[in-house]
Amino acid sequence: VLVLLARAVATGSVLAALTDPAVVDALALSTLTTSICVVLVLVLGIPLALLLARSHFRGSALLETIVDLPIVLPPSVAGIALLLVLGRRGLLGDPLAALGLTLPFTTAAVVLAQFFVAAPFFIRSARAGLAGVEREIEDAARVDGATERQVFRYVTAPLAAPALAAGLVTAWARALGEFGATIIFAGSIEGRTQTLPLVVYGEFQSSNLDASIAASAVLVIAALIALLLVRGLHWSRALDARGAG
């Protein structure tokens, strides 16, 4: 990784990449799709994480396994799974077609592929953070007249915030680097489905090594920033725990 960054900086290829139309389009598309993905992860992930953290019911272990499954699945298998369910000839292909919706090889397919592989990382972190919130504190808020929504907004969420934020950053980084599921389910159409990882692959296939290295360097820099943010959040949690102790 350090060699890649050093070469990219030494040759000035990173700056050149930022003016390359294909890289610029891919960067813009990646920014758009990962932003939408993060919103979906938050909206759908928090209720599921809360359910897994607070409720013990028959089948909860199975549900946890299903949620975690995309983490261990090869990305290409995830892409095939999405095609089998949401493709034109997939399980939901006909109902979607009846609604006039076609998902494969669209920008929406990119978002779905990113969400499929990234959401479990957020849910795992959020589940751990929410499970660590002391029920007594929440009960005290309820005694004072707080509604369940107010308890979550003003008590639970702030206490679990470091874990939620760390999970969200990790999910965003995973979505940004997603390749296998995207290329199978969404393809690599410039301006529509070609994200940065697909540019790296495409330029390498075209024997344009400098452009491939430059696009890779952009991804590495983004990954390093995400890693530093996660480490900072974990450090903040450790300090808070020591202070509380």
Question: Where are the predicted features?
Answer:
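Glycine-rich helix-loop "coupling/hinge" segments at transmembrane-helix boundaries
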Residues: 84, 181-207
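Short coil/turn motifs that cap or connect alpha-helices
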Residues: 58, 146-148
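Glycine/proline-centered hinge or cleavage motifs at structural transition points of membrane proteins
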Residues: 144-146, 158
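Short glycine/proline-centered loop/turn elements that form peptide/ligand docking sites
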Residues: 133-137, 243
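Membrane-water interface segments at the C-terminal ends of transmembrane alpha-helices
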Residues: 1-12, 21-131, 155-180, 203, ...
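Active-site/ligand-binding-proximal alpha/beta "capping" segment
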Residues: 152
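The alpha-helix within a helix-turn-helix
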Residues: 141
